[in-house]
Every structure is written in C-alpha cells, then in structure tokens.
Amino acid sequence: MNEGEVVLTPEQIQTLRGYASRGDTYGGWRYLANLGDRYADDAAAIVGKDANLNGLNLWMKKGVENLWDDTVGKKTRLEKFDRVALQHFSQYVDLINENNGRLPNTSEIERSYYKAVTENGVSSSAAIDLVINRSLPDMADGYWALGLGIEAERIHNEQAVNNPNGSERDNRKQLISALDKGFDGSFKEKHFTFLQSVIMDVTKLGVEYTIDGWQKIGGWGNGIINDLYKSVVKREWTGIFEIVNNNIKQFRDLFPNPEGWIDDGHQCFAPWVKETKKRNGKYHVYDPLALDLDGDGIETVAAKGFSGSLFDHTNNGIRTATGWVSADDGLLVRDLNGNGIIDNGAELFGDNTKLADGSFAKHGYAALAELDSNGDNIINAADAAFQSLRVWQDLNQDGISQANELRTLEELGIQSLDLAYKDVNKNLGNGNTLAQQGSYTKTDGTTAKMGDLLLAADNLHSRFKDKVELTAEQAKAANLAGIGRLRDLREAAALSGDLANMLKAYSAAETKEAQLALLDNLIHKWAETDSNWGKKSPMRLSTDWTQTANEGIALTPSQVAQLKKNALVSLSDKAKAAIDAARDRIAVLDAYTGQDSNTLYYMSEEDALNIVKVTNDTYDHLAKNIYQNLLFQTRLQPYLNQISFKMENDTFTLDFSGLVQAFNHVKETNPQKAFVDLAEMLAYGELRSWYEGRRLMTDYVEEAKKAGKFEDYQKVLGQETVALLAKTSGTQADDILQNVGFGHNKNVSLYGNDGNDTLIGGAGNDYLEGGSGSDTYVFGEGFGQDTVYNYDYATGRKDIIRFTDGITADMLTFTREGNHLLIKAKDGSGQVTVQSYFQNDGSGAYRIDEIHFDNGKVLDVATVKELVQQSTDGSDRLYAYQSGNTLNGGLGDDYLYGADGDDLLNGDAGNDSIYSGNGNDTLDGGEGNDALYGYNGNDALNGGEGNDHLNGEDGNDTLIGGAGNDYLEGGSGSDTYVFGKGFGQDAVYNYDYATGRKDIIRFTDGITADMLTFTREGNHLLIKAKDGSGQVTVQSYFQNDGSGAYRIDEIHFDNGKVLDVATVKELVQQSTDGSDRLYAYQSGNTLNGGLGDDYLYGADGDDLLNGDAGNDSIYSGNGNDTLDGGEGNDALYGYNGNDALNGGEGNDHLNGEDGNDTLIGGAGNDYLEGGSGSDTYVFGEGFGQDTVYNYHVDKNSDTMHFKGFKAADVHFIRSGSDLVLSASEQDNVRISGFFYGENHRVDTFVFDDAAISNPDFAKYINAGNNLVQSMSVFGSNTAATGGNVDANIQSVQQPLLVTPSA
C-alpha cells in the first residue's frame, strides 16, 4: 500500500452496498469522501440536493445539470439522471471490491460512467468528463481528473488519450506529447483565450448559483489570469488546474458562509452560556461510558464547533457539537433499533439512557447496571444483553458511526465489564471531566480502564439529522445556518408559514428603518420554530440551587460543595420588573443556544440584575449579527446584481460602473436610502477595491451636510457603522483610501496593505498606514492631528507625503521627537507625526522618501535631517546622527541627544538636558541649571554656570561642575572630577564597584592642598576651601574605611602633589582648635579631640578616644574602647564592647549600653547609665553629686565601687524609690528607682574594707521593715547633711557588712 492510499475493509465495502441498496447515492459518496476519496467528494456534490451545497460544489452540480440539459435535454435529465447516478455508484462499489479495497483509477471511472449512461439510453455526450472538455476544447480533452483534483496515482494515461468508448484520437496523443515536452510561445494566445473563458464561466455560474451573496466578492478576480499565465509559461501543466481549483475555492470563500455567522456570534453568546447555571441550575455536559482501548488512559478531545464531532445526545433529532472520545479509545454502545448505526444518546450508556421504570439513568454505570441480569455486579456472557454490546471507535471523529467503527466485545478481546467504580471527578483539561472510573477485564486476564465521562456541550453548533426538501422558490430565500434548536432559516421558513411570511416581508423591506422594524419579529418567528417553544413552564425565581439528572448533568460534586442554600432574597419592584421584561428574550435566547432556562437562580439582587443585563446584551448582539448577515441577501441584493467583470490589461477586474448608476438612481427619489445603503455596503462589505464607492460616499456626505440631513442620516446608521466607515483597509492592488467624511472631526484609520496606495486622511485626527508598495499620503488644508505609520522594508519603493491646498514648506515646522518626525502647521491647525521616521538615521523601513508641496518643492530625507537639527529661541529637541554632529541648543530649555558618533552638544542658554550617545562626546551645559548625562564613551561633561547635574555613566569620563552648586556622578570607569576657582558647593557621588578603575579629583587654577581642609562627616569626605569659597562633598567616601565602591582613589593638585586614600584618612583624624569630628577606623585608633567641642567616633577596633578640653561627645564602636571626656561637660556612649568610660572633670553623661562596662564619672555632677551587661560604677574621692540609672532586664551582676572609702564612711538613705549613698555633703550617689524592683538595683556595693550584696538586702527586707524604716528615718537624719549617725541605724547597717573579697 502506498503512503496515504485509501484501501477499504470488507466491512466498509458492505456499508457501501447498504447505501446502494437504499438508493442513497449522496450518502454513499459522502461516506467515501469521509474516508479520503477525492472523486467521491465531487460526485457527492453532483448528486446532492441544492440545499446541502454552496459555493464551488453547487457550481459543479449546476454545471453537470447544464451539460445534460444542453446535450440530451432537461426532460431526459429529470427522468434518468438519478438512475444513471445510482448505477454508476453501484458499479464503483463493485470496482472497489474487485480491486481488493483499492479505489478505481480514472480509466475505470470513465468506463463505468459511460456504461451507466449508455445502458440507460442516454447519449455519451453527457459523460461527466465532457464538462471540462467543453470548456477546454483546445487543450486536455478528457483530462477531467486533474481539474477535479483526483490523486495522481489514480490517473491512468489511457483516459487522457482515449474517448470513453475506447476510440483513439491522434490529436489528443499529440497534445499529451506536447504537454509532456513543455510549451513554447506559439501556445500563448490560445491559452489566454481559454483562461478568459474559464474565469468568465466560473464567475457567471458563481454569481447565479452561489446563494451566500456578494458580501466578499471584491478583488477575487484580480491577478488570477496572470497567475495562470505564469504557470503555463513555466511549463507547469498540472499547476494550471490547481490554480483554477484554488481560485474557484477562493471565490467561494469570499462570500459569507451561512454557517459563519454562528462563529461570529459565538463570543456574544459566551456570557449568556456562562450564566446557564444561574438560569437552570445546570452545567450542560453529556454523559457516556467510555473504554480505554490502547492502555494510556481514557483520552478525550474538546468540542470544536462544526470542525469537530456532532452527535444527537438527547434524542431530539439534532446533532450538536460535543466533547468526544479520542479515536484510539471507544464508547460503549448498544444498537437498540437494529439499524446498524448509533443514532443518539439513548444508544450510549449515560444520563440519556432510559431505564425500565421509565426514569433516566443517573450516569453511565447506572445505565449499564440494568443489563446485569444475574445480579453479580459484572456484565459478561452470563448476562443476556452481553452479545448486543458494541464499542464504537470513532476513527474519523465526526460523531457519525460507520460499520467499520462498531466492534463486538469479542473482537476486542473483552471478557467482562465491572460495575464497581469510584468517583474521581478528574478534569481532563479540554472541557471534559472523568466523573467515575472502574475497569473491564480482557480475555487474557488483564484489566483496563472504563469510565463515565462528562463531555463538554456546545449547543450553538448544531445540525438537524433530517433535511427539509425545498421547492425552487423556497431555495431562493435568504438563509442563515441553523443554530441551537433552530433549523437553517430557509428550512425553518419552509415549515413555518409565519416565519416564511416574515422572512419574505423582511427581504422585501427597502430601507434600514423598515428592516429594523421587522427584525424583532423575524428573530421571534425563527425562535418559535424551536420544538420546545411554548412547552416549558413559566420561569420561576429561586436562590435554592438543585441538582437535576436529565438533559445534561447538573453541578459536579465539587461545584455543589461550593454552593450553599440561602434564604430567598427579596427583590425590589424595579428588579422584578426588569426580570419580567427579559422573560421573552430569555425564551428566544434559549431557542438560539439550545438551553432551557426554567428557573433563574440568584444570590443577591445585583446577581439577578446582572443576568438581565447579560440577557439584553446578548439579544442585542444576536439582532445585530442577524441583520448584518442578511443584509447582502436582502436589501442590498439588487445593487450587487449590477456588478460585472471587465478585462483590462490582460487582467480581470470587477466593473462597478453599474453599481454607481444604481445608487445614483435610488438617490434621485430617496436620498436617505441611497446614503444608508451605500454606507452599509462600504461598512460591512469587502468592496475595498471599489474606489468610486468611497468617492461617491464622500459626495453623499457633503450633500447631506449642505442639506442639513447629515446628523439624521448618521443616527439611522448608528455608531458602529459610522465607526467602521472611519476605518478602511486596502487590498493587494493599488488603492485610493480616503476619509469619506463621517463625523468631520472624528478619528479615521486607513490601511493601504499591499500595492501603491494613496491615503487621504482628510479632516480629523487620522491614522494612516500605507503597508508595502510605493504609497502616497495626502494632506490638505485642515488636515488635523494625523499619524503616519510607514513600515515597509522593501527596496525600490518610494513613499511620499504630499501637501496640497497651497501648503508650502515655509508654512510648516519640522522637528524630531525620539525617532518620530513631527510636521506642524505654524498656525497650529494641524500636525503630521511620521512614526519611527529616523529609525536607522532615516534610512530604515519607516522613512518617507520625499515630501512634496504644491509649489513643486521637494524635501528628501537628507534635507529633513538638516531641518530638525536647527535650534530656535524656544525649547528644542535636537538629535545627533550616527556619524557625529555638533548641536547648539541656543535659547530656551533644550534637550540634546547624542548618537554613536563623537558629538559636541552645547546647551547654551537655558536649563538644558543633554544626553550623550555611544561615542566620545563633549557636553557643555552653558548657562542655566543643566542636566548632563554621559553614556558609553569617554565623555567630557562641563556644567558651566548654574546648579548642574552631571552623570558620566559608562566610560572614563571627565566631569567639570563649573560655577554653581553642582552634583557630579561619574558612573563606571576611571573618572576625573575637575574643580577650579569658584567651584561652589558641589557633591560627588562616585559609586563604582569595579576593580581596576582609578577615579580622581583634580583641583586646577592654582589650588593646592594647603588651601583646603579635609574633614569627615559620617562616611562623607568634606574638602573645604579655607577662604570659604567652596566645598566638595564626596559622598560615602569612607564606606568600608575608604576601600569601598565610593572612594576617590587620588586627589591631584596643580603643584603636582597627590593625596592617596591613606593620606586622606590620616588628614581627617587630625584635630584642630575648633570643634572637630574625628572617626576611628576598623583596625583601632587613638583619637584626641584637643580644644573645642568635639565629636569622636570609635569603630570595630579597640579605640582610645580622648575628648580633651571642651564639651565633647564621644561614641564607642564595636570594640573594647576607652573613652575619656577630659575637661568640660562631656557625653560618653559605649556600644557593644566592654568599654571604660571616664567622664573626667565637668558634669558628664555616661552611657555604657551593651557589654560589661566600667563607668567613672570623675569630678562634677555626673549621670551614669550602665545599660545591659555586668557594669561597674567607680567613685573616688571628690566624685560629686552623681546619679546612677541602672535599669536592666538581664540577670547580670552590677557593682558600685567606692575607692578610698570604708563601709562606715558611706550612709544608705532611702529617698522615695531611690537609694542615696552619701559619703559627705559634697559626695553622694543617687541610684534612681532602686526600690522599684530588682531590675533597677545595683547588686553589690564594694568598699575598701567590705562589700554589701543584694541577697543581704533581700534577707533584711523580708525579715521586716527595720531597714526600710531605718532608711526612711535616715532620710530625715542630719547625717544626710553631715551630722552623726544614730546608733540604732548603725546597728541595723552593721550586719549587712561583709568582708570584701580580695
């Protein structure tokens, strides 16, 4: 067998014989076509009924009928055509059987048809191959197989050189020989005549018989003849017929498909279908039982509309689109009526299976269980119905069972089906769900999966299983494909007199207003042909969600679990009225979507009103779709009859001259009708090649405006139609696209597509896109705010902007913004933005090659590039090109942009923004507060006067702030910051983490190091002029002790001196006689504050921080630091280490913070706070009036040490919650909050001869109030002021004394 060859099985041949025995030639040929027989596809078209066909197939059928009528007469055709067709089909099946399942070749087909014709007394001139022979008398007489697209391997040479009766013709042999050897120039004219004839014949038949209308006819004929001619010249003989076939199909596709409106409306129905569960409590799915036949699990496919499977699940005679079982698995079925096919869901096993008690099964397993006659929970040979079971493996996935797709269980090696299952509710990811899963057993003892599926339901895409025979008159009626539970409009009208009368009236209505007045009635009358119309109970309202078993499954178990029953929500009168008004529309939409909305479920009034909104929106979309899709079959049909074809320059083109005359004729008596009809033809048709139509529409618009009727006409058209008219697309030809004038100042979009197009935006803010080809954009007076998008990468094209109505170049300004070109009218009346014009410096795919003016002046790209670099006195945007340029901003706040070259960018006056490109650029801000940005190169940035912002970004840049207070940021690379005389108050931000870079500050104009001071503030380095004229702050210089990413590596001076980082670090630790800020480094340092009120900061090392004279602030770091306040009132702060804090002279503030710290207040009245850790407070002779705050939450041991004092020298006095230890009138220590609790106490008091510990305090306090009272008395004793201590007090105090440890 050859790859792709169709070979039928004995079962399939038997199925064909069944079609023959029933006289169903159309069904038999369609069966073969579905198996891949190309000849059968055409044969089915020829024997089919008109109502089943459209486009090319209908043309072929009419062609054969015309052949019979012309050769043997219409009477003979009516009497004998069906007999000939049936005999030919039967003989064709016999040939397949004789060829062991292989399809007949073309010679066998010719002989069969000739035999059928002649044996029924019909002349052989009616043989089918002569249809093409008549059209091609000078070419391939008999070569009909190529024209029909039959497979090459089935084409037998004999049929190309012999008559059907076997007589040979020498001229055909000669022709075939010539074809085999190729053509020469002598055939050219003859071929062209033949092609003209073919196209004209196809066009004539297509117009006459293609019932779908003329909606998309525009442009189909252009280029066909040229393509065919080229094929002949290239000696591709078979290509001629392929192109004929392809273009005929292309012609057919240009007409609106009567089924296409369903897909167009599918999105508008989506919100309605989504709300199904709120109208009937159900998710619509179908429920069959399926078997895994290939061992990889049960696989399914999504519902795919008309391109997928359609099946009558509900036994209502309508096949609907459905999710389906894949071709390698199967459905368990039972042919109940014995007709050899599976007709509907009743013959599957699911919730459409009717049980013996008259109810419907809950699911597939429940349906199958009824066949378990012996009650063993297994279906096998012991059960009576086992032999009647089949597995349907839908090989071609069409939802129609064929004999070769139905297999017995024995053929598949299935021994039994197990009725046990588990609920799995597995989402299969394509709209389908595996609800229950069990297994079946094979004859070899292995098991495989069997499951109950919930298949997705798409009731919109539907086909009735029976066809309505139409009369010739009925077949001429306008038509739309059936949808939901509705037949094709034409068939439905054949069965409903009311609908037929309404369709006739609608088709005869001559104006849009008249059609719209009838549209609702037409929609309703079609809906009333639904078999369920009027049978449903009135819709009720409920908040009680329920599950229903039949007509698809209700909510899945997981979905049910998510819903809770609610008390009935009371609806307002307004909401009830809205629902009542929507009831009729809900019924209509049910018919169109195949739904049943018996109950409206809602959770709130807002929920109910949303359903009403969805209903109304969906109905409005439905009405719009029906109106638009009937438009060209009804009211606009008479105009289409005026379109013809003409031959120009060896090419067929559409001739619209008669159409223009037709509209003008209507306009004479009814201007509004002509206006509206023409507008809708342009808006909803595909007549883009009809330039005269758009010009005619423009004339109609202007006349309507003059007559004061334009707004009225627009209201009749509606907003959507007006919007469509404002957007126009061209074809592959040379189009003229123009704003036809709707909404004078409204936006218009014109798309040229292929070809050399002319786009005229007109008034308003228009978008014009030329597409490929040499396009011209025309702008006249009052052209508005327009945008041109001219992407076309082709070479050799020449795109032009043309200004008319006297517009000259000096009336316009040319500027650049980004890559866009802006052409502005100086009087402010309009602007044209050419998007991306300057991409690739104006040589890219978006350029406009020339700009033309009425006075003959032409600007090329080079001239435009010069114009947009000229500055003005205003705020300009100037851009350099890749080659390198000098740009001068002049006056105004300007934006200057460098490119890839080495550019000189001068801001001049004003607050300018200057951006470098990829080159080594020079940026000069000039006057004003400027922002300068380098980029990738080694750039030089000079801020000039003013407070400027400079950023070097990448590269080794030089930054000169100039006068003013400037901000300088070098970016990456080795950068140099230059400061001269009068440099101002500047900041340097030098973050660059790269290794190997070397950043420098350079002082010029004779500035030397001894003219500057170097100090540190936080992590910043401050370099100040001693005369106060300027300062440079190097931000974060000392981050990571000056080795971080912010450092300046060297500081250079005019005298050649260089300071490195180490030297700068030393300089900033030198004190002065003033108030200094000195910082230690991580390694540990000694800092001396000297004179002045100084700030000293430790770091991570063990630092010695001496405040010396002055009121100093000293801050420890993380090490074990020594802080000495020296003279003055000082503040000392420890940190994390075990620090030693000595206040020295003066009234000092000491805070140990973390660590085991030692705090010595020294002379003066000091405040001491130990913080956390085990701290020691030391007091010596003359320590003054000190306060200790010793609050802590840890369990450390704090000590107060009195050096030079014996225990008897110090008296304990309670003062409120404080404990006062008094050594003399001048020297005492107050422990703040001592009696608040243990967290405030000092644990041990140490004297030269003894120590008192906290446990001793607790002991005596717990024993009684003696100590407390005595201390209270002591508080008023003269001892506090230097008197004698009472003997009682001494006796209480004495037991507390212990000998201090060594």
Curated annotation (Swiss-Prot):
Entry keyword set: Calcium, Cell outer membrane, Membrane, Repeat, Secreted, Toxin, Virulence
Pfam families: HCBP_related, HemolysinCabind
Start and stop residues of the Hemolysin-type calcium-binding repeats: 742-759, 760-777, 888-905, 906-923, 924-941, 942-959, 960-977, 1088-1105, 1106-1123, 1124-1141, 1142-1159, 1160-1177
Predominant cellular place of this UniProt entry's protein: membrane
Gene3D superfamilies for this protein: Serralysin-like metalloprotease, C-terminal
Function: May participate in the pathogenesis of meningococcal disease.
Domain notes from UniProt: The Gly-rich region is probably involved in binding calcium, which is required for target cell-binding or cytolytic activity.
Name of the featured protein: Iron-regulated protein FrpA
Organism in which the protein naturally occurs: Neisseria meningitidis serogroup B (strain ATCC BAA-335 / MC58)
